[in-house]
């Protein structure tokens, strides 16, 4: 049992040395504050806020585990999907949704470059990189759709001459 614990400790130390520092955009997401719950929040909004806060707490915990070499990249990708998805659901206005999606896309673009380097260095798998790329393309599609809906909404709101 002691040998097993020692092996886990050594693995964590080695993984920590190999784990690259998180990018500024990722750190901004991880360091974001929890959303304040208000007594007069409608029940659905309250649930959406609680879900976002749970996702943010999980993200903070998973990134802490990553920094200690105790979690894998797919878990970080999955938690980021949940976190950004929960944040998008907090907003009704298409332009606010688009802002969140743009931030998510910016994080994924930065993460893709970092992950590509890790794959080249043998520290991550090609499968992890392709999963991130799939998610990035999905966000690009969602962002394009959100911008098109926002543009359609604005053009319909404009009076005709």
List where the protein language model places each region.
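Short, charge/polar-rich alpha-helical segments
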Residues: 31-49, 87-99
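Short, charge-rich amphipathic alpha-helices with coiled-coil/heptad character
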Residues: 23-37, 80-85
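Short, solvent-exposed mixed-charge patches
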Residues: 159-161
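Short, solvent-exposed, mixed-charge loop/turn linkers that connect secondary-structure elements
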Residues: 125, 152-157
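Amphipathic alpha-helical coiled-coil segments
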Residues: 84-98, 137-153
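Charged, solvent-exposed structural "stalk/scaffold" segments
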Residues: 44-84, 97-139
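Sec-dependent N-terminal signal peptides
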Residues: 1-12
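Compositionally biased, intrinsically disordered low-complexity segments enriched
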Residues: 14-24
């Amino acid at each position: 049992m002691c040998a097993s614990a020692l092996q886990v400790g050594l693995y964590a130390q080695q993984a920590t040395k190999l784990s690259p520092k998180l990018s500024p955009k990722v750190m901004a997401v991880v360091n974001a504050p929890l959303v304040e719950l208000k007594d007069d929040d409608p029940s659905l909004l309250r649930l959406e806020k609680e879900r976002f806060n749970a996702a943010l707490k999980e993200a903070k915990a998973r990134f802490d585990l990553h920094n200690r070499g105790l979690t894998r990249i797919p878990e970080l990708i999955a938690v980021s999907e949940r976190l950004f998805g929960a944040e998008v659901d907090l907003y009704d206005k298409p332009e606010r949704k688009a802002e969140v999606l743009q931030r998510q896309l910016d994080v994924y673009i930065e993460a893709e470059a970092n992950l590509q380097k890790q794959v080249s260095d043998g520290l991550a798998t090609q499968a992890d990189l392709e999963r991130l790329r799939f998610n990035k393309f999905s966000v690009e599609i969602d962002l394009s759709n959100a911008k098109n809906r926002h543009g359609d909404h604005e053009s319909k709101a404009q009076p005709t001459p």
